[in-house]
Amino acid sequence: MTLRDKRQKEFAEVWLNSKWGILNLCPRFGKIRTTINILKKLKPVHVLIAYPDVKIKESWQDEFRECEYVDGFITYTTHLSLHKYQDYNYDLVVIDEIHLLSEAQIEACKTLLENNDKVLGLTGTLSKSTESTLLSELDLHVAATYTIEQAINEGVIVDYQITVIKVPLDNITVNDYKGKKRTEKKQFDKSIRKIRRKHYVP
């Protein structure tokens, strides 16, 4: 068992203590794997997973396949369609990327949460303002936080590396920039002059 696996199990246990709240776990840590640990313990029959876009749904399905976890009992929905499920009762409600809920979606969640007693919010980028809103509007507290600094220090994730690749601007091919014919380099030079004038840079 890797340290990442161990931490995922630990955070699953933290949430399972109350079966209510938000896990604020840094990007690339494994929020879905943490949730799978929760599902294995709860053994739910009906689960609702809400996500902001289809790419995230695909991530869930990919992880379930990789872990050989059957997801036939799971209802998937977008944040936008949460209102369609607000009157139903589930063994577990998972709201992924909970920090992205709009005001209207939070309103739909109020009814949903009144009808359900096991709610897991997932995020990796939770501002203090959003944390306060989710607590006051939905009574969802942060059950645990694992920052990117902690994950890097423990070697659970690798630090970001940024590589800058410099390429010369094309000064031969003429392009159309809002009706003006210029090369890429001349357009760039013009943009730089404009920025300097705006900010009084000599």
Question: Where do the model's predicted regions map?
Answer:
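Post-DEXD/H (motif II) to motif III coupling segment of the RecA-like Helicase ATP-binding lobe
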Residues: 100-160
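Loop/turn-to-beta-strand initiation segments
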Residues: 46, 71-74, 89-92, 116-120
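Inter-Walker segment of RecA-like/P-loop motor cores
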Residues: 50-89
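Walker A/P-loop
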Residues: 18-38
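Conserved RecA-like ASCE ATPase "motif II neighborhood" in helicase/translocase motors
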Residues: 73-111
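Conserved pre-motif I regulatory segment
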Residues: 1-24
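Conserved interdomain linker/interface between the two RecA-like ATPase lobes of SF2 helicase motors
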Residues: 142-202
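Conserved strand-helix element at the start of the C-terminal RecA-like helicase core
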Residues: 32, 47-57, 189-202
